[in-house]
Amino acid sequence: MDNITWMASHTGWSDFILMGLFRQSKHPMANITWMANHTGWSDFILLGLFRQSKHPALLCVVIFVVFLMALSGNAVLILLIHCDAHLHTPMYFFISQLSLMDMAYISVTVPKMLLDQVMGVNKISAPECGMQMFFYVTLAGSEFFLLATMAYDRYVAICHPLRYPVLMNHRVCLFLSSGCWFLGSVDGFTFTPITMTFPFRGSREIHHFFCEVPAVLNLSCSDTSLYEIFMYLCCVLMLLIPVVIISSSYLLILLTIHGMNSAEGRKKAFATCSSHLTVVILFYGAAIYTYMLPSSYHTPEKDMMVSVFYTILTPVVNPLIYSLRNKDVMGALKKMLTVEPAFQKAME
């Protein structure tokens, strides 16, 4: 009875019940591998960013400040788009979706990393690692397709302005946005289960600050070459489709802008497109390095730096790009800041 109590308290009731089921299985070795991968007996160890830093406390504070800036910047952008009627257009609807993804994206990795540093813990259980991997891959995939959708929206707005309200009505926007989230979740449901079912080495030290797919795969003690080829092909497809949409959209946009008579119209179109292209280059460039370059180009240190760039810095930069260079957003922000004191004065 004491053994039962100990097992229940140290593995969790779900794992304890699964152990009972495994005793009746015909494949004991497979069960041992599954238990080692999925219970708390052998947690992963995240070596993280702070291990090699000369000033880990300062780095922790900087990342925390950046995290707060990302959350507040994207939250303010979503609030402005929701509250200002002039921003109730398809373009700003997709920008609000991008901000929502960025808030979730940075929240998947940074809070766990900071909490571990403060608590002096660097372990993560296999289920937690799998959940982190799933949400990370899902959000990254969703953002790939959302950036392509935003490029298509700009193409319709600039090249077919008269048909724009019909082609990009509210129902179409909801459908496209839902499709981006769905396709991203397909990536998560595809890569996460396969990656987490590989048998891992005894050390289980992940040379990263979160459970990124390539970093976890490096721990596998079995041949992953076939899966890596499959993952590479999926990434090529996942990147190729949005890149084709973005490239063709902006090619047609440039041709349309070239034929415009109004200098003001050309300037506004260039400003809108350049903001989006900046975000595309930042996000896609980092993704291509991580998932498409050969392993000879990779080192744990380089991978972590690139991951810091597109998991921590990009969510901070995006709202700045779409707000500071956008007169409509800045106008809505000024209106909100001026209305608030006037409202308080009227209440007094």
Swiss-Prot record:
Major subcellular site: membrane
Cytoplasmic side: 82-89, 153-171, 252-268, 325-348
Keywords associated with the record: Cell membrane, Disulfide bond, G-protein coupled receptor, Glycoprotein, Membrane, Olfaction, Receptor, Sensory transduction, Transducer, Transmembrane, Transmembrane helix
Membrane topology, as annotated: Multi-pass membrane protein
Compartment list: Cell membrane
Residues carrying sugar: 31, 37, 218
Cysteines engaged in disulfide bonds, as pairs: 129-221
A single GO BP: detection of chemical stimulus involved in sensory perception of smell
Function: Odorant receptor.
UniProt protein name: Olfactory receptor 2T4
Species, as recorded: Homo sapiens (Human)
Gene field: OR2T4
